[in-house]
Each structure stands twice: as C-alpha cells, then as structure tokens.
C-alpha cells in the first residue's frame, strides 16, 4: 500500500482503522508472543548437525510432545471424572484425546518427507536418544492401562521423572476406573478384578466382558456407560492408527535398521500394533 500523504498522527489513526481497530501498541500490555512465551518455545530448537533437515526432525518431535502434554492434561482429568461418576465432562475430554491422536496421525506425513539419505546424515548426531524414552508417552500408556515396570528404567537418571512415572504405574488406569464405575452401578464385575494390583496393567477378564455386554444389550438403562464404552473404543481406534502410521513412517525412512534407542526399530513398533488396551470392549463385539 502507498504511504499516506497525511501527517504521522493522521496516518496512525488511518492505520488503526484499516486493521479494524486491532491493538497495535503493546508497550504496556501483554501481547500474543508474551502470553504464549514464544521467545522460549521458538528458542528451544538446537540442531546438532549442520544439515538443513534436522530442524524438521526436532520440531516434529517437540510438537508431538506438546500435543502429548495436552493429552495427559485431558486423560488425567477424564480419569478423575470417571472415578467420581461424572461422565459428562469425561466424555468430552476423551473425544478431545481422540482428536489429538488424529492430529498426530496426520503429522507423520510431514516427517515422511524426510528421505533415508537425509535421515542418515543426521542420525550420527542423535546418539541413543529415541522416542522410546518419552516419559510423557510412557505416562499416556500407563493411564490407558498398558503398564510394565521395566519401562521405568530409561528414566532412572531423572529422579523427579522416575517418581512421577512410578506414581502413574501404581495409580488405577482410566479403564480400571470405568470398570469400578460399572460395579458401582450394580453390574457383575468380579471382586478379584476390582482389587487387583493397579501396576499389573490390563488383561482380559470374563466378568468385565459380561458387564459390558449388559451395557450394550440395554443401552437405554446404562446410557452413560454405553457412551463411555464407545468413547474408549474411539480413543483406541485413533491410537491404533497413530501406531500404524508410526510404523510405516519409520520403515520408509530407516527400513529395518535398529532404532537409535537400541530397539529393533520397525520390528518393535510392529509388535506394539498387537497391544489391546480395552480387550473386553473389543471381544464383546464378536459375542453380542
């Protein structure tokens, strides 16, 4: 746009009107960047190699961790609401978690623009760092019932993280709380399932499937539980898609080479595709 021929003061007034009276002076006010702490966020990328493509690799993983932070925020709150029997807020939170997984599924397409040649250039600079060591991802798995105490070991060098993950390991999962809620509403769940060690993780239990079957056979009677069950299925469905896209992205970039963290890479990721978080909810579909 051509400079306005009027005075500076008049120009400033015209400019403010042109931008629909948007605030333009933040000398004494909080700006967008101030609120989001963008100076810190955008100054947290430190490539170790001289290669152009490492920035993509860093930002891909940093943004994934930010989405996982939100996911944990929602899952922790949803679990508390289920525990207290307040399913309305929990259902909304679980729907949001599913959409976060969908967001992360689409994000793999960006990393997939990195070719094997490009990745091989930066791989020597990564050391043994690996997504396998993500403590936020580990807590997500624990909240969803996929628990294994051995997976605490990569965090033993960080006392505060280890303590938080140990607490997550021994806290009943979201699914544990859903099962307890069914029992509280009079559905027949075995006492053994209700008092089992929370750190043991989820495994199939016949009485739980029987209870869920009653919910599905009489949804009008157990409408909130019926909705909860479907939200859990939605969540695991999206999680499975994320895992599958993870496998295919890694395979197209590194093939079947070992991962930087020492795992079998694609072989390990493929084995995780067989993980079932809510087994009774899936099995009952064959038995309805």
From Swiss-Prot:
Gene3D superfamilies: 1.20.58.480
Alphabetic keyword roster: Dioxygenase, Heme, Iron, Metal-binding, Oxidoreductase, Tryptophan catabolism
Pathway assigned in UniProt: Amino-acid degradation; L-tryptophan degradation via kynurenine pathway; L-kynurenine from L-tryptophan: step 1/2
EC number(s) from the headed UniProt entry: 1.13.11.11
GO biological process: L-tryptophan catabolic process to acetyl-CoA; L-tryptophan catabolic process to kynurenine
Binding site for substrate: 57-61, 119, 123, 260
Domain of life of the source: Bacteria
InterPro entries (alphabetical): Trp/Indoleamine_2_3_dOase-like, Trp_2-3-dOase_bac, Trp_2_3_dOase
Entry keyword Flavoprotein: no
Quaternary structure, from the entry: Homotetramer.
Similarity section: Belongs to the tryptophan 2,3-dioxygenase family.
Job description of the protein: Heme-dependent dioxygenase that catalyzes the oxidative cleavage of the L-tryptophan (L-Trp) pyrrole ring and converts L-tryptophan to N-formyl-L-kynurenine. Catalyzes the oxidative cleavage of the indole moiety.
UniProt protein name: Tryptophan 2,3-dioxygenase
Organism of derivation: Pseudomonas aeruginosa (strain UCBPP-PA14)
Classification lineage: Bacteria, Pseudomonadati, Pseudomonadota, Gammaproteobacteria, Pseudomonadales
């Amino acid at each position: 746009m051509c400079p306005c021929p009027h005075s500076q003061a008049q120009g400033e007034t015209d400019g403010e009107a042109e931008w629909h009276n948007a605030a333009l002076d933040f000398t004494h006010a909080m700006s967008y960047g101030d609120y989001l702490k963008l100076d810190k966020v955008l100054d947290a990328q430190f490539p170790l190699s001289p290669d152009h493509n490492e920035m993509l690799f860093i930002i891909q993983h940093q943004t994934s961790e930010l989405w996982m932070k939100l996911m944990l925020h929602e899952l922790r709150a949803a679990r508390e609401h289920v525990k207290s029997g307040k399913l309305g807020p929990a259902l909304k939170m679980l729907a949001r978690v599913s959409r976060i997984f969908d967001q992360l599924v689409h994000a793999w397409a960006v990393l997939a623009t990195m070719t094997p040649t490009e990745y091989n250039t930066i791989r020597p600079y990564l050391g043994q760092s690996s997504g396998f060591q993500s403590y936020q991802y580990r807590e997500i798995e624990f909240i969803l019932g996929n628990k294994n105490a051995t997976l605490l070991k990569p965090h033993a060098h960080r006392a505060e993280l280890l303590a938080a993950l140990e607490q997550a390991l021994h806290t009943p999962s979201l699914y544990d709380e859903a099962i307890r809620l069914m029992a509280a509403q009079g559905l027949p769940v075995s006492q053994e399932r209700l008092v089992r060690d929370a750190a043991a993780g989820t495994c199939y239990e016949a009485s739980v499937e029987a209870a869920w079957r009653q919910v599905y056979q009489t949804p009008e009677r157990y409408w909130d539980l019926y909705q909860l069950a479907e939200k859990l299925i939605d969540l695991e469905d999206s999680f499975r898609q994320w895992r599958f896209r993870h496998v295919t992205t890694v395979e197209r970039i590194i093939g079947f080479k070992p991962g930087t963290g020492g795992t079998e890479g694609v072989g390990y990721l493929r084995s995780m595709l067989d993980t079932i978080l809510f087994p009774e909810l899936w099995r009952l579909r064959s038995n309805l």
